[in-house]
């Protein structure tokens, strides 16, 4: 019905394609929150890997805050580095300043930072606690050896070894600063939905799972805890769901981890203002496709 209405007005549909759209996304990933009342039920709705990522970020000293208008340079720097790595076009700081001026408080520029000193202090305290526990278990084992105590000693020793590796990483991290920007995201609030418009992350801090916590906090603050019921539009996916080698596979799996569903839109339309020019453009496009197919 929609297609017929547009066609009756002279518009031409560009087709039911897949991939990332240049004019408009034809495929989006959308999350609604029926039955979600608080953070506990929100986390429970995620896939196990995503839930682990959110919890890992929090226990790794990652904190999310909103950027002020005078801090947009940090956002732009992270997005620019991400764009260079992934091959999409980054906007400059002036663009985002104008964006903020236009949308005002509805444009939420969020930053995930690693609080390295806080992380190091927490891991050190946990290390001391485990070391004391291991000493206590060994003392009890020497006094009265049991299989149960031996198992507890082995488990605690393994946990202590893993924690020592994290401590070494945290000590190295503090050389980059006490608070380190790791990822950013722009959420835009509308009456019925919040849009996860664009984001960026620094690969050297991938292990800290900052992007997962950013999305979680966006959903929690701007949808679940909002007085205005909203859905969460995670925006573009390619629309290819059964090809593990598709260019958008990683993005799809990341978004799927937060639950939700794919939403297929009608796509792009054009209105020819010159029949001759339109036919020439279509012919050139067809020739290009044939050449690409023949390679």
Tell where the protein language model's regions lie, with residue ranges.
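Short, contiguous acidic/charged loop-to-helix segments that flank catalytic cores in large enzymes
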Residues: 200-210, 239-246
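Active-site/acyl-donor-binding loops of N-acyltransferases
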Residues: 9-37, 229-295
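Hydrophobic or amphipathic alpha-helical targeting/insertion segments
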Residues: 1-4
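Secondary-structure transition/capping motifs at alpha-helix termini
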Residues: 222-228
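Conserved acetyl-CoA-binding loop-helix of GNAT-fold acetyltransferases
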Residues: 206-220
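A conserved beta-strand-loop-helix scaffold within acyl/acetyltransferase catalytic domains
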Residues: 8-207, 225
